[in-house]
Amino acid sequence: MKKLLLGIAAACLAGFTFAQDAPLWMRHSVISPDGTTIAFTYKGDIYTVPVAGGRAMQITTNPAYDTAPVWSPDSKRIAFASDRMGSLDVYIVAKDGGEPRRLTTHSGSETPLAFTDAGHVLFSAGIMPSAEAVVFPSNGQFNQVYRVSVEGGRPTMISSMPMECISINKEGAMLYQDKKGYEDYWRKHHVSPIARDIWMYTPGKEPQYRQLTTFGGEDREPVWAPDGKTFYYLSEENGSFNIYRRTPGDAKAVQLTHYTKNPVRYLSAATDGRLCYGFDGEIYTLLPGGEAQKVNISIVSDRNDKDIIRQIKSSGATEMAVSPDGKEVAFVLRGDVYVTSVEYKTTKQITNTPCQERTVDFAPDGRTLVYASERGGLWQLYTSTIVRKDEKLFTYATELKEERLTNSDAASFQPQYSPDGKEIAFLENRSTIRVINLKTKDVRTVMDGKYQYSYSDGDQWFQWSPDSKWILSDYIGVGGWNNKDVVLLNADGKGEMVNLTESGYNDGNAKWVLGGKAMIWTSDRAGYRSHGSWGAEDDTYIMFFDAEAYDRFLMNKEETALLEEAEKAEKEKAGKKDEKDAKKKKEDADKDKEKKVEPLKFDLANRFDRIVRLTVNSSHMADAMLSAKGDKLYYLSVFEDGYDLWEHNLKENVTKVLLKKVGAGALQPDKEGKNIFLCARDGMKKIEIEGSKISPIEFEAFFDYRPYGEREYIFDHIWQQVNDKFYVADLQGTDWNGYKETYKRFLPYINNNYDFAEMLSEMLGELNGSHTGARYYASGAALPTAALGVFYDEAYAGDGLKIKEIIAQSPLTKKKTDVKPGCIIEKVDGVAIKAGADYFPLLEGKAGRKVILSVYDPVTGKRFEETLKPISYGAQNELLYKRWVENCRKKVDEYSGGRIAYIHIKGMDSPSFRKIYSDLLSESSRKKEAVVVDTCLLYT
């Protein structure tokens, strides 16, 4: 599948030049304090423009993403965030451009918030809370606020509590928006306990925090008015985000703008009272008592992106299909279909679109491929056929013909050829099984969609019978969406559906075996189940539809050998008789060539008496297949580290590992059953069963990467997914068609994944639904900053780092050491830590590596060295979480006088459930009169 966050079609770019007189999607706009200039982000760079409008000046030109500009009080410099070192760091640059100076070096993400004065910048980062903080320790969700000099150096913590969108008046009082919990930042219209409010922080000997707004929805982005007494902010109090004015302590607010559809964003104010804000992708200003004025901007800049980038790829296949002769495999790579030789790297590109193709299948004659493609926002079926009769293989074909197979207004995908090649079954609207006759193009329904439930595309399974008259499918029946069964369907769409398994457990992935006389399927009826979440271990079972086949399957090795000898003798006898009649021999040869398949007959009345469990151990299985003779089961299972290929000899009852760590995927045998093909995360493979030999299937695929085209496709894909699958049919009254047009027009002005993710989140935010939004994360710093697992004394201003507390289970607690709170770390690997100097570079890339700390103990006057292995910040955050839980437990115990227990639910997963189950029912908890269940979830 096309990876989230990439492009719009080149045709869409033809309508404008790179001297853009009306650019859109200008974000993070902020007016300078002197009111003369506006800085903003456009296409990943920082620009400035006169407040009256005109030609914008490009301040940064680095290929990295630059964002979030903040003006210095004297309007001479701009601080901004950039990922030019792999993660977002804070930089500062002159207002007219030049070489920026890097101010922060930690490998996390740092974003500037405001200047405290001309010499210091406040920024947000999730580095380390204070030892006294009660804020829930999450990975980057509840950041601290730090101050750093414009010359760089060691950051100083200002607040361990999250403070977003800070504005500071002349007296030093800070306005900020709070953060109470996790929700997508761009979600709109929600009224909930975690909606943001405006607060005021007054520093001093006795710092004061005062809540200024109480609306149950979102209040954001406060900025002081020039008088330092009143302030402006954004609120959804009357529908969409608009600008309001309020005085601290006054319950009434004055609404200044009255937009009804799109939100106002990025509010800022100059010392002359002029406001600046973003709306509908453009920038506006507003003078007190006046009317809003759009800032007309033109941008002239070089273009550093391309409509199409030619690439050659040798990895990345996500699915595959094996040709009938086993000489080729069709596969999907980044949404395009290819065919490659099994033995050679030669590769033929079948499709070349910025859209997504998937679920490819070969016709029985090997000359046609069928696949699904989401073109124009709608999944439909397409075929590609070898035109020249003298060409037998797709890999070397010189002429192909693509045709659209379905022409409906319903999503159609997951096509599968019938064994006789006359029809194709597919899914319509994700759960209805339909069949199209390739000769007449008539389409019929085999199973109504109400009998299946699809959570995500591709989660449904069905398979044709060998005689092309029946289909096995997953099935939920009535009210069984969480307990799938296997159903037998008549492919003509008539007759009664038969629930073959009728189980309260999950049964699925059924496959025809033994020529259609039986099926194998997976079931979790015997496996260990997750104690507190989804999932269970599976087994493979076989069900026989034929009594004779069942009896034969139960024969031991000796009985089977005797039967096969008898059948061989009978066949040889029949063959000698046929040789006497040459004409009959030719007729029989022709019949063999046709390989006519006899219609299947089913004895279903006794099917439950003919079920055999094939696997000896329940496990987490990826797939399974039965040999053609039915004497061996092959399956992919994980017991330790990675998926292994197992073989279970059913006649000898011997189980062994054929190959270790082959990966997870679908097992696809060739026609003779001698080889297994597998598409795993690490590539496509051919496995020769005899000898357990595995060979990579290599390819060289030409790929046309179209960044703009892919972004347009992904936009349409996401819009359609919501339209098809949102949990309420009316989309909560959202004008979804209208918003598609609103946001799609921004695509030509977006050239990077950060902006694209933000734009998608803005559109999805219109739904007012939780768990929505798009994400893009930078690659991260090449050398992540390591952690020592200690709290430092923020009040200490001398050389080195003074330890305030050593966190339990951190590196310094795992060995006998003289290091204790109060000690000062003077050097790291021999490099001295000077007062005010940035020490993070000394720990770059050192997690898990031995580091020598030079330590001074002021109490004893002793200096000594300590060797340890620092941990990652992720590992340190886990220790902080455990410390936080223990502190909460102690507080509850203290405040209740030991009468109330405390447990915390870490996440929505099985380990978290097991933890609370153990803690809640432990003897210490059972002695309590009540329990506090804390449900603040740790998102990782």
Where are these regions (language model features)?
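Blade-terminus and WD-like Trp-Asp/Gly-His loop motifs, strongest in beta-propeller folds
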Residues: 30-35, 69-77, 113-120, 166-174, ...
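Beta-strand-rich domains and repeat architectures in extracellular enzymes and scaffolds
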Residues: 21-47, 316-335, 615-631
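PDZ/PDZ-like domain segments forming the peptide/carboxylate-binding groove
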Residues: 783-836, 910
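Cleft-lining beta-strand/loop regions that shape enzyme active-site pockets
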Residues: 804, 831-938
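A flexible loop/linker signature enriched in serine peptidases of the S9 family
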Residues: 20-23, 41-47, 60-66, 79-91, ...
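Extended, small/polar residue-biased N-terminal targeting/export presequences
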Residues: 748-798, 862-866, 871-887
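Bacterial Sec-dependent N-terminal signal peptides
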Residues: 1-21
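A short helix->beta-strand "capping" segment at the edge of beta-propeller domains
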Residues: 20-26, 54-56, 301-317, 398-404, ...
